Amino acid sequence: MALKHYNPTSPARRGLILVDKSGLHKGKPVKALTEGKRKSGGRNNQGHATARGIAGGHKQKYRIVDFKRRKWDQPATVERLEYDPNRSAFIALVKYEDGELAYILAPQRLAAGDVVLAAKKTDTKPGNAMEIGQAPVGTIVHNVEMKPGKGGQIARAAGTYVQIVGRDKGMVMVRLNSGEQRYIRSDCMCTVGAVSNPDNANQNLAKAGRNRWLGRRPLTRGVAKNPVDHPHGGGEGRTSGGRHPVTPWGKPTKGARTRHNKATDKFIIRSRHAKKKR
């Protein structure tokens, strides 16, 4: 779907660029496939604020999306594409031959009336799901499992995808959007195609209120605060902070590595940080 550029008929419209959603379903979601969703406001179970910048936003219903795609060898027809407030990608309502309805992540170039299939091995057609070991080398896939049966975890955001680059000893080598190359078990499921709504990143919301509708609060820079409130605070006039970027609690941020998982390090062939090391 294309981007929609608005005319500056008011200050709030100047520079406004949004994704054109005219091709999406305009009604409500399927009630049986929705759940209630309570906003946390960035608070944990003790009421303490653990995530800053989260508050308010429009009330949302959670859509139950099938990330597992384990209903094998049963064709499903795409009824319609829908907006989902819980994710950046669009979702597709599919109807199986036995009448069951389900939501799946909508890949690019999927339209109402298309037939999708999940099987151990199937055609490389957008929306079809199969074991990643059965897909040809070079295939673009998304919604990739990391453990068989757990459901897709990699490449679920708008416009993302994974490319299969090779096979080795029952494992499949894939390249992620970040540049990382890693092994994935060949019996993990994946869905063919790239995720829909690739223009999501090119939107310009044009006004603060539109961010508030999405539940995002303003973020105050550390250098604009007092020394009592942030390690970057204080100084006479405008200062640059004087140290590597840190959080208000002094922990490194903006590119500092936080991954500590020796058990799965062996599956990473090439780190996403490899370019930085040179």
Swiss-Prot record:
GO terms for molecular function: rRNA binding; structural constituent of ribosome; transferase activity. InterPro entries: NA-bd_OB-fold, Rib_uL2_dom2, Ribosomal_uL2, Ribosomal_uL2_bac/org-type, Ribosomal_uL2_C, Ribosomal_uL2_CS, Ribosomal_uL2_dom3, Ribosomal_uL2_RNA-bd_dom. Residues 269-278 have a biased composition (Basic residues). GO terms for cellular component: large ribosomal subunit. The keyword rRNA-binding applies. It holds the Pfam family Ribosomal_L2_C. The keyword RNA-binding applies. It comes from the Bacteria. Signal peptide: none annotated. GO terms for biological process: cytoplasmic translation. Residues 28-56, 221-278 are annotated as: Disordered. Keywords: Ribonucleoprotein, Ribosomal protein, RNA-binding, rRNA-binding. HAMAP family: Ribosomal_uL2_B. One of the primary rRNA binding proteins. Required for association of the 30S and 50S subunits to form the 70S ribosome, for tRNA binding and peptide bond formation. It has been suggested to have peptidyltransferase activity; this is somewhat controversial. Makes several contacts with the 16S rRNA in the 70S ribosome. NCBIfam families: rplB_bact. Belongs to the universal ribosomal protein uL2 family. Part of the 50S ribosomal subunit. Forms a bridge to the 30S subunit in the 70S ribosome. This is Large ribosomal subunit protein uL2. It comes from Rhizorhabdus wittichii (strain DSM 6014 / CCUG 31198 / JCM 15750 / NBRC 105917 / EY 4224 / RW1) (Sphingomonas wittichii).
